[in-house]
């Protein structure tokens, strides 16, 4: 199975619904590094629907920022604990006076630009249809976050959603 032409890696959207949102809405498709919701399993039910779109948006923005800064995804935990580091690093390197909110908007704009390219190229995304119907053992879960709910990822204020 694939999303936007990219094969689904180890994380099944039926058991980690936040990663399913990322696969469907990320400009890169089924790329777990685009916004891996695995770490959210400590703070929210990974098989639940509530909050998954918002969590995916936060993680995708942080992933886009790390990619844009040219740093490895493995340093993300430090940024999750102290997200102001994004602005501090850019300010130190380039002599800017960016706030964390400025940087969040930059990450969001990056994702929206990539998604606009996909739309113009005819690339659309959703999890494979069978994942919405076929239950995954042992919890017998399906991916039940609607396309309409996932589309909200593009209208949620990225700055307000980060805290």
Predicted features along the sequence, with ranges:
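Extended C-terminal regions of large enzymes
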Residues: 1-163
